[in-house]
């Protein structure tokens, strides 16, 4: 495989201003900009962590959250195609249920499916996306943050930033973007931030619509038929209001309100003799969260948050038997508090306590309409001595449930340990080792969904080991090279899968999976001046995730479904005085649509190539930005999910204005 090795990304340079003051007299001199580099967080961390800033995503032409996460090593994004297709994230073959999402410091949950659809988030107001695998170096976090094998952290913009992701520090900031493109895309957005002495007020709103109709080729044996993808339209509204109030020099209070509404068609799987689909999905989500932090001293601090979340969704279809409609409602109340202290030099301790109350109601007949109460308690420590950094944590989980109809599960109670160790062997070389024992609680659908739910399910258990090395060096102050490599081993037991019975399917603990893999990332950046630079980035993942359930099964040892053995990405960004030019490539190797590795289930690999051109203009102290993105230059209708063809070559034009 010629395409297995690649290189990884983009570090944002830091500008430093040097000033000189004469010892006898004061003189005013011009600013001198010194080119420098910021070391990637992945290089310094004791467990794998990868990040993308707002400036990175903008210049690379990254369109949505799924597109951003595809560039991280060890990540598979399940994309159902179309402009508004659902997107979930699978880390190292564990399944989307093992991936947590934190939005501005507070966990995002979905007790019904256990998976967060990342298509509901837009990138216009995102300042940073990070992916943490295993034990986090940051122990100043909520207890629930320890409850996932991997964590996606999303931070929103508080006002806008410059091309180096630095705040512009203006009191009044206003930015608007209008996008248009293929498939009837039209998407305006508005970002506002006003800073007073102690109070900050921010607002963000966006609208997106697209008809989603695109051509694709349908093959049946030797015949190829030209078809059009229909029922892939989408109309989405998003809005946020943020208030930040500095109570004192040591205390801050933050409040956020979020609203989301989406109406979209579900195009369904492509069937040779019937490409029609009438499935529709309406999603509505509202949440509000309050955050408080008090830094009592340099050695002790406390933060707490409260959140209320309401989600409503309606699925409808018109099958041969007549109109069908299902309505689901979720409500969540969530509380968290974390105390951090430094009792000794180099030793940090934290204690976190979280509580969540979830209720799910369904319009299905004989629906259980369950309620879940969850408690998480986490004790963590971080110790640094010499060239060593050690992190450890212990999470206690206690979950109880009750239902309106039938019998509830017995609940779930478990201790989950984790640790990581980093050794700085040389000035530029670090070695790291980590272990995490975690479990996934069965979702309310898996436990109580009418007809297939199983109240006797056990948690899905995961044990993960990681051994890696990182290297970063700057040559002649103009060239920086960063490399990371992580090998890992893991196993999943009591895997929850749907098992066929005599006349129906039922969720069962009937699976075991073993994972052996390697993640490599690399970044090289050459800076000749402020106006000229070149960044080359790449990532490569090898993953052997095989079924280890029953040695007598014919598919024992086969690769699990939708998990390629080889995947990767590469990017190159050239910054010039006239414009920025970027090239991106995504590689997905061969995989299987079912856990039985036979030719009928094989899905061929593909590469997706894209380019982005962007230009900034200064007009009357205001900034205007034009950007053109062209995706899928090969015009291939490849499939990420079987029978869900992706669009061919498509384009997007963006115009942004900042006051």
Which residues does each PLM region occupy?
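Short, acidic, small-residue-rich periplasmic hinge/interaction motif at the N-terminus
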Residues: 19-58, 66, 96
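Extracytoplasmic beta-strand/coil segments of soluble accessory domains associated
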Residues: 66, 70-107
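A beta-strand signature from Gram-negative outer-membrane beta-barrel systems
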Residues: 120-175
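Flexible loop and strand-edge segments within Gram-negative outer membrane beta-barrel domains
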Residues: 210, 214, 226-236, 246-332, ...
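Structural signature of Gram-negative outer-membrane beta-barrels, strongest in the C-terminal barrel
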Residues: 248, 344-354, 358-359, 363-490, ...
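Membrane-embedded beta-barrel scaffold of Gram-negative outer-membrane proteins
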Residues: 303-315, 431-432, 460-516, 521-525, ...
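Gram-negative outer-membrane beta-barrel transporters
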Residues: 345, 483-491, 509-594, 621-623, ...
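C-terminal beta-signal and adjacent terminal beta-strands/loops
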Residues: 488, 587-594, 602, 610-659
